[in-house]
């Protein structure tokens, strides 16, 4: 066992992203996703992930998806034999001369009223946090590092 989650069904949503080149400053600063997992269909360059302390471009490969693990999954696997780290990433701003960028993003997040549990590889409980408390801490850290 690596960890667990208890509460309602959580939230999942599908986001159709459109980065309009008429607003060339659109982009996303470095961040990690709060939830469990994010699945992305990347159709144009611009997504970068942090590898060895440096941001690198994620290649656009037709028919392939990118998967980001989030902070909730990182939290529940912290004491396991195989910790799943949250992926720090960013989306570059576009220039007005770039083609319009589209993407499809699926987010799977725990219910804010739920509890995340941590277990070690032998199944012993190691800790827990309410999802709301964990997300509040992550938001505080993100705000302080702007």
Specify the residue positions occupied by each region the protein language model found.
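Conserved double-stranded beta-helix
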Residues: 1-48
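Catalytic core of Fe(II)/2-oxoglutarate
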Residues: 42-137, 143
């Amino acid at each position: 066992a690596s960890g667990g989650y208890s509460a309602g069904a959580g939230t999942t949503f599908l986001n159709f992203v459109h980065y309009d080149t008429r607003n060339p400053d659109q982009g996303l600063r470095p961040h990690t996703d709060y939830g469990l997992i994010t699945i992305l269909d990347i159709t144009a360059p611009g997504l970068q992930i942090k590898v060895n302390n440096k941001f690198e471009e994620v290649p656009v490969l037709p028919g392939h998806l990118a998967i980001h693990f989030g902070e909730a999954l990182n939290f529940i696997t912290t004491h396991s034999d195989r910790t799943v780290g949250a992926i720090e990433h960013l989306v570059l701003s576009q220039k007005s001369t770039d083609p319009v960028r589209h993407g499809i993003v699926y987010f799977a997040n725990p219910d804010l009223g739920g509890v995340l549990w941590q277990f070690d590889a032998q199944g012993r409980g190691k800790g827990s946090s309410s999802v709301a408390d964990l997300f509040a801490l992550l938001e505080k850290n993100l705000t302080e590092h702007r």
